[in-house]
Design a protein with these regions (language model features):
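Bacterial Sec-dependent N-terminal signal peptides
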Residues: 1-28
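Short hydrophobic/aromatic segments of transmembrane alpha-helices and their interfaces
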Residues: 6-8, 59, 135-136, 330-331, ...
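Ser/Thr- (and often Asn-) enriched beta-sheet segments in non-cytosolic proteins
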Residues: 24, 33-35, 70, 277, ...
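Short, P/G- and charge-enriched loop/turn segments at secondary-structure junctions
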Residues: 26, 130-132, 230-236
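Outer membrane beta-barrel
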Residues: 27-164, 168-204, 282, 287-292, ...
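Outer-membrane beta-barrel pore domains
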Residues: 50-52, 211-377
Length: 380
């Protein structure tokens, strides 16, 4: 019954967007442009070395429908998504742009982490690295200002700790974000991107009976959500504030692609409790067996997919540690390889192999290495 209910909700939202678009199309003032957007990410996974009895299977990793509209200097985006048996509001924001500047307000990603802010279709692998999943945030409600030139990108914002699909009965915390990117080399098929981002955040002040008040949680499902267990998790209670810093490196050279990040989260805790630090990093590279070069999204300073039809070979190493200050969140290392075929700018087939090395205080499973093969098809 739950699945039927979710299906009916998503069908209603889909019909509402499509009906609205038809009505709007008949009454559009001159200069307004809009388009219906969609995304379909289907994944399947098989665990090859499987001492922990992980379940093989398939899933809709992401299913979306939405609309984009532009009018003069204004832009708007509204997108609904279905994943993990939940219907949720994804992006919901308006943007005003003037020359090289823009102001964005609504619900969207905070300006932190290359792998988090880029489109899921543009990811090299079926899933972001554990360091990114654990140490970054999803979309939040807020306002941000950005400025860009050929060689620089700057973004700063103010966000509440709230999203439209997970409203909290709480006095919401807030976050102040900043991101700076320098591109000493930026020309056709060649790019050097060096970035630095930081966030200062306060925890939610929830109701007195809520055990999770003043708590920051960091967690990761490992390398796949086919078996959706949380393998590494740290709940840092008695938190006063949090400071995150992230460094970025992105290099393009014709068929070659290199991307890496280091992320560190420091939690200042109340008197009598030891401060906590979590950290993680990843490094990935790609080579185009077919195709010529990679795209780059200058508006948000993040990597894109290969241009046109392409065949891509990828490799990635990820490390994450959530053990500190007596909190045993766990550690993980994993090595992944991928082969991606981009049929066109809308459709791609991705084959991934990941080898997971659990460290101390891993959750849910024994400290035994395992591997998984995933295949996914993306339609945007």
């Amino acid at each position: 019954m739950k699945i039927i209910g979710l299906y009916l909700k998503f069908s209603f939202l889909l019909s509402l967007i499509l009906t609205t678009s038809r009505i709007t199309a008949q009454n559009l003032p001159d200069g307004i442009q809009y388009k219906i957007t969609g995304r379909l990410l289907m994944d399947g996974g098989v665990y090859l070395k499987n001492p922990n009895n992980f379940g093989n299977g398939t899933e809709f990793n992401d299913l979306r429908i939405g609309v984009k509209a532009t009018y003069q200097n204004w832009g708007m985006k509204l997108e609904m998504g279905y994943a993990g048996n939940k219907v949720a509001i994804k992006d919901a924001f308006a943007t005003y742009s003037y020359k090289n500047s823009s102001i964005q307000i609504g619900q969207f990603y905070e300006p932190f982490s290359l792998d988090m802010i880029c489109s899921t279709f543009d990811l090299r692998f079926n899933q972001s690295p554990g360091a990114v999943l654990a140490l970054t945030n999803s979309r939040r409600m807020g306002v941000a200002y950005s400025y860009r030139t050929q060689y620089y990108y700057l973004c700063g914002g103010f966000f509440t700790d709230n999203d439209l699909s997970n409203l909290k009965n709480a006095s919401q915390g807030y976050a102040i974000d900043g991101r700076l990117v320098y591109r000493p080399l930026y020309e056709q098929a060649k790019l050097i991107h060096i970035g630095l981002a930081a966030i200062h955040r306060t925890p939610d002040g929830t109701l007195p009976e809520d055990e999770n008040r003043n708590t920051f949680t960091y967690k990761s499902p490992g390398v796949s959500t086919i078996d959706n267990r949380t393998l590494i998790q740290a709940d840092v209670d008695h938190a006063a504030s949090q400071f995150k810093i992230g460094t970025e490196l992105l290099i393009y050279y014709h068929k070659f692609f290199l991307q890496g990040e280091y992320i560190r989260a420091h939690v200042k805790r109340e008197k009598g409790f030891e401060n906590y630090t979590a950290q993680g990093a990843y490094l990935q590279c790609s080579w185009l067996l077919l195709g010529q070069n990679y795209l780059y999204d200058e508006e948000v300073a993040c990597p894109g997919r290969p241009e046109g039809k392409a065949l891509e070979l990828c490799a990635r190493f990820n490390y994450l540690s959530l053990n500190d200050a007596g909190i045993k969140g766990g550690t993980q290392k994993d090595l992944s390889f991928g082969l991606n075929y981009y049929i066109n700018k809308h459709i791609a087939v991705k084959l991934n192999y990941s080898y997971f090395i659990p460290g101390s205080h891993i959750k849910e499973i024994e400290s035994t290495n395992f591997s998984v093969v995933q295949i996914g098809r993306a339609h945007v």
